[in-house]
Amino acid sequence: MALEKLLRSIPKVDEILKAPELQDYLNRYQREIITRKVREVLDELRTGIVSGQRQKPLEFQEVVNLAQRKIESFFLPPYRRVVNGTGVVLHTNLGRAPLAPEAVEALRKVSGSYGNLELDLTTGKRGSRYDHVVEYLCELTGAEDALVVNNNASAVVLALSSMAFGKEVIVSRGQLVEIGGAFRIPEIMERSGAILKEVGTTNKTRIDDYRKAINENTGLLLGVHTSNYKIIGFTESVEIADLVKLGKEKGIPVMWDLGSGSLVDLTSYGLPYEPTVQEVLAAGVDVVTFSGDKLLGGPQAGIIAGKKEFVAKMKKHPLTRAIRIDKMTVAALQATLMLYFERDFLSKIPVLRMLTEPPEKIKKRAQKLYRKLLRAKLPAEISLDEGKSEVGGGAFPGTYLSSYVIKINPHHLSVEKLAKALREENPALLGRIEEEKFIIDLRTVLEEEIDYCKRLLEKHLVGDRQ
């Protein structure tokens, strides 16, 4: 009898739909989707009653509030902007490289209109979508030709399939990396149709290891830049120039997967040496592959640059169409590459600006936020301290950049609860938790985001106390 009474307390769908709180949603969205969300709430309540989790009759307003929250949650975009206070510049989970304003504007112009993606406006005949970026890539890298696909893993698969299908590809055992998401070089190679031939050991590989492994079925010598981990101690690896020399001696092409792939030597900004795309190609490598959304600072893309004879063959490969880039990637990449020709490109490309920004400038932003938080007299212990940022994106492993951070120790709620509340905002604010304090690293927080950070912290620190 008690169960029946509880079930009878569940309002009807039509009654909920008449509630004033839902009228704006009904005016804006299709009635069917709002009705479906209301039914989902009622079904959940019914299940809770039958299972014994709910033992009190339902109040009508309570159900309306639940329905409203369900609808709001549904229409809140799952993919939304995030203020990055983690200090990780190329945060994979946050989309890696933020685009430069010029690239964003290029996206805006082409995404909402038509464009000459595959049309030569001079001749009026069909063109190639790759023409929009190939000239810039060749000019910047010194390559004879270039091709862009949807990501670097695709670039590697395409290059291997085109250059060494059914043939052996010799690679050092110490370079058989996992590139993220459980995707590993051996598995990628298998899908390409190439045959993996490992040489050397995890910590030591010599040029003679490659030489001894070469036979009549060798199709390619492959080097993989281990940008996402570092082996130290008793190690030895083969220099790019030595592998190129062996390749020329034996008439075997050499390919190098650079992964993060920088066009800029960042050693003068406190980062360790990493070979640039230009240096690898200048050393004589036939084909190099790298990402567009890491150190380059552009959209997600896999870039293939190198000798014309190899790249031209890839452009005709059947796989190329399956992994080609769309008009938005073309526009964003073209705009990003154009910035590299400007004198002040380091300050215009967000990733490079963040990586090369002096700690003194970061400190000024940190002081600005710190003063705002102190003036707000929030119920928390707040301090400004030196900190360490990371490059991220599988680049420069074990390398930290000097930065400045705000540390927050809430008085009336746990640091985990604060972090969760900030994550659920729109835009979300992400930081990191260290020693029971919420940390905001100002290296990755933009000047225009400081006031927003202050408002969110005030909302959740003061709001929780009230």
Swiss-Prot record:
Q: Which Pfam families match?
A: Se-cys_synth_N, SelA
Its function, per the record, reads: Converts seryl-tRNA(Sec) to selenocysteinyl-tRNA(Sec) required for selenoprotein biosynthesis.
The family database entries (NCBIfam families) matched by this protein are listed as: selA (TIGR00474)
Top EC class of this enzyme: transferase
| GO MF annotation list | L-seryl-tRNA(Sec) selenium transferase activity
User: Which Gene3D superfamilies does this chain map to?
Assistant: 3.90.1150.180, Type I PLP-dependent aspartate aminotransferase-like (Major domain) (3.40.640.10)
SUPFAM superfamilies noted in UniProt: PLP-dependent transferases (SSF53383)
Superkingdom, taxonomy of origin: Bacteria
| EC number(s) on file | 2.9.1.1
Please, one GO biological process term?
selenocysteine incorporation
Say which family it is in.
Belongs to the SelA family.
This protein's UniProt keywords = Cytoplasm, Protein biosynthesis, Pyridoxal phosphate, Selenium, Transferase
Indicate where this protein is primarily found.
Answer: cytoplasm
Q: Does the keyword Cytoplasm apply?
A: yes
Entry-annotated residues carrying N6-(pyridoxal phosphate)lysine:
294
- Names of the cofactor(s): pyridoxal 5'-phosphate
**The protein's annotated pathway:** Aminoacyl-tRNA biosynthesis; selenocysteinyl-tRNA(Sec) biosynthesis; selenocysteinyl-tRNA(Sec) from L-seryl-tRNA(Sec) (bacterial route): step 1/1
Question: GO cellular-component terms in the record?
Answer: cytoplasm
Protein name, entry field: L-seryl-tRNA(Sec) selenium transferase
**Reaction(s) the record says it catalyses:** L-seryl-tRNA(Sec) + selenophosphate + H(+) = L-selenocysteinyl-tRNA(Sec) + phosphate
